[in-house]
């Protein structure tokens, strides 16, 4: 029996305003989860993440298992004790990272064998091992082990991949056993709507605490992503959280909320920040462009983050050009605050019954 509780507070069309409750704290949805692959969101402290409004962060099973390893983390207690984040943590199962290894992996019914990207040693990962690692980490939300269907894939390739993921989903559920943490199933099936239907049906029969859409934002055209979202999101169980994995841009988030999604994660705001690619209320600003060299204006006058309250575009441009670590930090603080504020504004619009109006205005005004 999971300790997670989900409350659907309000709906507008397909868009949902909700709350996911855990002993470690509540997650107001729609929610964006900053990505802390190795247990830390790059350059930021837990205090800073809380100040910007994050209710939950994402850690990566694959990377934490390889380094530092669960034995070291268990000496502290859980991942929360190790990294100082006392709110909920979701851990990805490692399936996507194995997928990204490409030809360096060997896939069988039992699991995946691959060379460690750290020291080249032979490593084996299976649904059972992934569930044990996530139990050891003390994850609040555990993701079942799956194979992320590559793009492009023929219908047969997508079907074979999806069916393997469904068998692994059942093994994940069995191995999860009496773990009170929430376990989410992952819908696969590539760009084929009927395969997505088959996958969702299988996952409903296994019965999970939440449902995720996987295998999107892997190189497919935007219209295909929207088509699969349109087809799939509203069919997911109404009484459980819906999570879109690895997506995406501010526009993607607004459009996915419109289609009924509750949870998101993406490396984009933090990774792009380190490359001087800033998200603002008016669209994307590329701070390393020469035109910002003598621009004394604030990055985003509509933003309340530390960066926007204290530093000019000119200074941020200077930090980027000189590759100062502070530049990465200030940029990351801004981008993640922007994403958290976007979700807060979406939640408020849903509470006030004006999300459709908010969406229309956002899509008209946001450039990039």
UniProtKB/Swiss-Prot annotation:
<keyword id="KW-0808">Transferase</keyword>
<feature type="binding site">
    <location>
        <position position="146"/>
    </location>
    <ligand>
        <name>substrate</name>
    </ligand>
</feature>
<keyword id="KW-0819">tRNA processing</keyword>
<dbReference type="InterPro" id="IPR050076">
    <property type="entry name" value="ArchSynthase1/Queuine_TRR"/>
</dbReference>
<dbReference type="InterPro" id="IPR002616">
    <property type="entry name" value="tRNA_ribo_trans-like"/>
</dbReference>
<feature type="binding site">
    <location>
        <position position="215"/>
    </location>
    <ligand>
        <name>substrate</name>
    </ligand>
</feature>
<comment type="subunit">
    <text>Homodimer. Within each dimer, one monomer is responsible for RNA recognition and catalysis, while the other monomer binds to the replacement base PreQ1.</text>
</comment>
<dbReference type="GO" id="GO:0002099">
    <property type="term" value="P:tRNA wobble guanine modification"/>
</dbReference>
<keyword id="KW-0328">Glycosyltransferase</keyword>
<dbReference type="GO" id="GO:0008616">
    <property type="term" value="P:queuosine biosynthetic process"/>
</dbReference>
<keyword id="KW-0671">Queuosine biosynthesis</keyword>
<feature type="binding site">
    <location>
        <position position="188"/>
    </location>
    <ligand>
        <name>substrate</name>
    </ligand>
</feature>
<comment type="similarity">
    <text>Belongs to the queuine tRNA-ribosyltransferase family.</text>
</comment>
<comment type="pathway">
    <text>tRNA modification; tRNA-queuosine biosynthesis.</text>
</comment>
<keyword id="KW-0479">Metal-binding</keyword>
<dbReference type="GO" id="GO:0008479">
    <property type="term" value="F:tRNA-guanosine(34) queuine transglycosylase activity"/>
</dbReference>
<feature type="active site" description="Nucleophile">
    <location>
        <position position="265"/>
    </location>
</feature>
<dbReference type="Pfam" id="PF01702">
    <property type="entry name" value="TGT"/>
</dbReference>
<protein>
    <recommendedName>
        <fullName>Queuine tRNA-ribosyltransferase</fullName>
        <ecNumber>2.4.2.29</ecNumber>
    </recommendedName>
</protein>
<dbReference type="GO" id="GO:0046872">
    <property type="term" value="F:metal ion binding"/>
</dbReference>
<keyword id="KW-0862">Zinc</keyword>
<dbReference type="GO" id="GO:0005829">
    <property type="term" value="C:cytosol"/>
</dbReference>
<feature type="binding site">
    <location>
        <begin position="92"/>
        <end position="96"/>
    </location>
    <ligand>
        <name>substrate</name>
    </ligand>
</feature>
<feature type="binding site">
    <location>
        <position position="308"/>
    </location>
    <ligand>
        <name>Zn(2+)</name>
    </ligand>
</feature>
<dbReference type="InterPro" id="IPR004803">
    <property type="entry name" value="TGT"/>
</dbReference>
<feature type="region of interest" description="RNA binding">
    <location>
        <begin position="246"/>
        <end position="252"/>
    </location>
</feature>
<dbReference type="GO" id="GO:0101030">
    <property type="term" value="P:tRNA-guanine transglycosylation"/>
</dbReference>
<feature type="binding site">
    <location>
        <position position="334"/>
    </location>
    <ligand>
        <name>Zn(2+)</name>
    </ligand>
</feature>
<feature type="binding site">
    <location>
        <position position="303"/>
    </location>
    <ligand>
        <name>Zn(2+)</name>
    </ligand>
</feature>
<feature type="active site" description="Proton acceptor">
    <location>
        <position position="92"/>
    </location>
</feature>
<feature type="binding site">
    <location>
        <position position="305"/>
    </location>
    <ligand>
        <name>Zn(2+)</name>
    </ligand>
</feature>
<dbReference type="InterPro" id="IPR036511">
    <property type="entry name" value="TGT-like_sf"/>
</dbReference>
<comment type="function">
    <text>Catalyzes the base-exchange of a guanine (G) residue with the queuine precursor 7-aminomethyl-7-deazaguanine (PreQ1) at position 34 (anticodon wobble position) in tRNAs with GU(N) anticodons (tRNA-Asp, -Asn, -His and -Tyr). Catalysis occurs through a double-displacement mechanism. The nucleophile active site attacks the C1' of nucleotide 34 to detach the guanine base from the RNA, forming a covalent enzyme-RNA intermediate. The proton acceptor active site deprotonates the incoming PreQ1, allowing a nucleophilic attack on the C1' of the ribose to form the product.</text>
</comment>
């Amino acid at each position: 029996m999971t300790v997670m509780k989900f409350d659907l507070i309000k709906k507008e069309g397909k868009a949902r305003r909700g709350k996911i409750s855990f002993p470690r704290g509540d997650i107001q949805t729609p929610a964006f989860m900053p990505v802390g692959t190795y247990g830390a969101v790059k350059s930021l402290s837990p205090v800073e993440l809380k100040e910007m409004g994050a209710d939950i962060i994402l850690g990566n099973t694959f990377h934490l298992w390889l380094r530092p390893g669960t034995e070291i983390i268990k000496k502290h207690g859980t991942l929360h004790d190790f990294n100082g984040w006392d709110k909920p943590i979701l851990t990805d199962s490692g399936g996507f990272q194995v997928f990204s290894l490409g030809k360096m992996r060997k896939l069988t019914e039992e699991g995946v064998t691959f060379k460690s990207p750290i020291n080249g040693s032979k490593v084996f990962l299976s649904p059972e091992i992934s569930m044990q690692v996530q139990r050891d980490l003390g994850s609040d939300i555990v993701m079942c082990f799956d194979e992320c269907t590559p793009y492009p894939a023929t219908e047969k390739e997508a079907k074979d991949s999806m069916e393997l993921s469904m068998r692994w989903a059942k093994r994940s559920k069995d191995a999860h056993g009496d773990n009170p943490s929430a376990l989410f199933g992952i819908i696969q099936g590539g760009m084929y709507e009927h395969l997505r239907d088959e996958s969702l049906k299988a996952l409903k029969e296994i019965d999970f605490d939440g449902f995720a859409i996987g295998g999107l934002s892997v190189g497919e055209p935007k219209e295909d992503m929207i088509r699969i979202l349109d087809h799939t999101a509203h069919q997911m169980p109404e009484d459980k959280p819906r999570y879109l994995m690895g997506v995406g841009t501010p526009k993607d988030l607004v459009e996915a909320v419109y289609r009924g999604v509750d949870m998101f994660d993406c490396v984009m705001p933090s990774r792009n920040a380190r490359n001087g690619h800033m998200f603002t209320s008016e669209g994307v600003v590329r701070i390393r462009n020469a035109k910002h060299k003598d621009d004394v204006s604030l990055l985003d006058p509509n933003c309340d983050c530390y960066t926007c309250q204290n530093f000019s575009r000119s200074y941020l441009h200077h930090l980027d050009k000189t590759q100062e670590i502070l530049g990465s930090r200030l940029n990351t603080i801004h981008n993640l605050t922007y994403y958290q504020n976007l979700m807060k504004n979406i939640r408020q619009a849903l509470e006030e019954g004006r999300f459709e109006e908010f969406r229309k205005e956002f899509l008209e005004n946001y450039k990039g």
